[in-house]
């Protein structure tokens, strides 16, 4: 079904090739909500009657199935409205372009996903805090250059993960704030002669503000790319953790045991415990980076203003988002069930402690360092400092000393609570604004 005017004729294969129907299935509800806001704004601005607004809103509510044969969701919805309401349904095209409409719907969908992901990261961080509380004295190795470094604890490792997640959480929250601005009312590129209140439309849709310049509003995808970029940073970090756990659970190192639900055996070798979930996560991180790369490559050569290339970016937003959603769940499950096996730390991992103790007695550190190093090379080094003693000797904030770790846990718990509260208040503000849209809609149709 071709609703909008075209030049010349169009072959079926061309319609199929340029159609965005498949990727538009992701934003059906958002497109409907944006259309409602537009119809309500036309009514509030005096361009359509209450009866026309009511009939159009009821038609929007009756649109459920996105059928093949249309160029996109916008064409399908408008055709449904006109067929349901009659000629009066054609008012939905007044003061509106698919360009500002889709840009708004994409932001609504990304906003929804980002809020979900932010809550999921909070949940994961809480898991790490609870695991840390019972792991302050469980010895755990550290590595630099993947060579044994110094003794640490499992709690120290868990809090390292939480620390990185805190940073990434704030990156993603900043993306949420950028995404939550409204393009609606910007028309195709230079606005419209129809006197619409863009700020009122933005309020009804729960946005914080409008994107002022109409060229930017209709054709920029930088805020969405920024969101995918920050989600990719989360996957980048998850991939490092996956690599840690794959190596540490291998029979060569054998320091951690992964939950049985996240390993698989071999069809031939019955002794195998393959870290299959983490291997898939590691590869899915690459898929997310591929989505980001695709966004860059599609976007980089476009002249300013809307181009249909932009619709080919949409599937990459949602692919990365869904990878992130499932990966958070996987990491959470693995970290909840991970076990540290009995293992022996090499005495030489406390060599730094020995050198520092010598320096504390008044020997210049480099001289103390060389004294210890020479004994190690000569094979005569014996440390009287146990790994457990080593961790208790650590004197700086952020180190694995259990006493300092417990203080860090309290600080992190407070920070998580503050960030969760901030997110909840922000979400409630959005919901409160959108409730006004629902109130007006109900007043019109009931």
From Swiss-Prot:
Source superkingdom: Archaea
Keywords: Amino-acid biosynthesis, Arginine biosynthesis, Cytoplasm, Lyase
Gene Ontology molecular function terms on file: argininosuccinate lyase activity
EC number: 4.3.2.1
InterPro entries: Argininosuccinate_lyase, Fumarase/histidase_N, Fumarate_lyase_fam, Fumarate_lyase_N, L-Aspartase-like
Cysteine disulfide partners in this protein: none
Pathway given in the UniProt record: Amino-acid biosynthesis; L-arginine biosynthesis; L-arginine from L-ornithine and carbamoyl phosphate: step 3/3
Gene Ontology biological-process annotations: arginine biosynthetic process via ornithine; L-arginine biosynthetic process
Subcellular location: Cytoplasm
Gene Ontology, cellular component aspect: cytosol
Catalytic activity from the UniProt record: 2-(N(omega)-L-arginino)succinate = fumarate + L-arginine
Keyword Transmembrane helix carried by entry: no
Enzyme class, first EC level, given as a word: lyase
Family annotation (Pfam families): Lyase_1
Family designation: Belongs to the lyase 1 family. Argininosuccinate lyase subfamily.
UniProt-recorded name of the protein: Argininosuccinate lyase
Organism, scientific name: Sulfurisphaera tokodaii (strain DSM 16993 / JCM 10545 / NBRC 100140 / 7) (Sulfolobus tokodaii)
Protein encoded by which gene: argH
